[in-house]
Amino acid sequence: GLPVCGESCFGGTCNTPGCSCTWPVCTRD
């Protein structure tokens, strides 16, 4: 739901729990 997780995912993975990679940033549901 929230657009930003405060993390980028140029490598394709997110370290923040509950976040997924919508390149090039991590997004939350």
Swiss-Prot record:
There is a cross-link at G1-D29 (Cyclopeptide (Gly-Asp)). Keywords: Disulfide bond, Knottin, Plant defense. Pfam families: Cyclotide. PROSITE patterns: CYCLOTIDE, CYCLOTIDE_MOEBIUS. This is a cyclic peptide. The keyword Disulfide bond applies. The keyword Disulfide bond applies. Signal peptide: none annotated. Probably participates in a plant defense mechanism. The presence of a 'disulfide through disulfide knot' structurally defines this protein as a knottin. Belongs to the cyclotide family. Moebius subfamily. This is Cyclotide psyleio D. It comes from Psychotria brachyceras.
